Structure formats: C-alpha cells, structure tokens
Amino acid sequence: TFDCWVAYTAPNGKVTAIKPHLAAWVDVRSRMILGDVMCKDANSDILKESLLKLIYHDAGSVPQYIYIDNGKDYTAKDMTGFDRDDRQRTGFDDAAVGFYKSIGIEDFHRALPYYAWVKGQIERFFGTVCGRFSKWFMSYTGTLTGSKTFAKVEKDIDGMLERGELLTMDEFYEAWTNWLHNFYMVKQSSALKR
C-alpha cells in the first residue's frame, strides 16, 4: 500500500480517496520489478493478473520457482492447490495443482509468518518506493522522519479530493510506470556490484 492518496472512481461512478495497492514480483537475480499491477484492493485475482503480466509482458517466460508471502491472497487454495493450513502439501491428484503450477511454475515456497526479513529484496524495494517515489506527492501521509505512527503527516485528504488536487488512479499509475522504468530500473542495485 502506498502512503499517498489518489482519486478512485468506483464502478458506480462515485469518486473516493484511496491508498493504492501494488502487486509486484522481484527477480532475485537481477532485482528487476516485474508484473506490477496497481489496484484498489489486492486479492488473489490481482495476483493472477500480476503473474500473467510478468509472464506475457515483462519477462516473456515463466519463473521456475517463486517465493510467496504468507498472506491469504498468496496462499489461497485456488493459487496453491492446497489448504492454507496444509504446510505438508498432502494433495495427490490433479485438483491439487493450483494456479501457480497450472501456468508452469515448478514450485513455490512460503515465507514464514512474522519473518519479513526473509523477503528482503521486495521489502527493501518497498522502502525505496516510499523514500524515492511516494514522498514526493502532495497527498503523502506517511512519515517524514522515521516509521513511527505518531510521526505521520496530517493532510486534509477529503478537502484535496473535493478540490480536485488528487491524481486519478490512471495518472498515478502513469507516474509510477515512468518512475519505475526511467529512474529505478536504470540504476544497478548496489547488492549486484560486489
């Protein structure tokens, strides 16, 4: 979730202020961000869309393995082929395939709950997004000095929405795509310089 607000037009035409969500995958070897999809609320359908974008648009091939978060969207039965609580993967029939295997991914590995550091590459990327992208928007309501909740920036988001000062979701995605491809992806990761 970005720490800035955008104007979102619901299917019924009502415009509200939301914090957009980003679904994306990081290639651990190159640190490239692939399959980025922005949405109002992330769910397993958004993750499917993100993986399909990764395969057909960004990477042009299916990843052999993926490392997934422990969230319910990533571990839903239609994604993995197994019940969320079945860590032993005891399915033996074709019904246990799930979306990941159905598109050609050989295997997936789940992060342990409350161990954010095992997903270091994507978590570090989200920190970079906050520091180098999100903070520059007028609607930014994250922290300026650290990660303390009491240090969050107060803004009149409803007033900004009424005055038309918030970017639309499409405008925000356009700014995001520009930043991702023209600023982030052109720099070599310091972890790869060794």
Language model features by range: what are they?
Residues 1-71, 110-113:
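A short, conserved beta-strand element enriched in hydrophobic/aromatic residues
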Residues 63-64, 70-194:
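Globin-like tetrapyrrole-binding proteins
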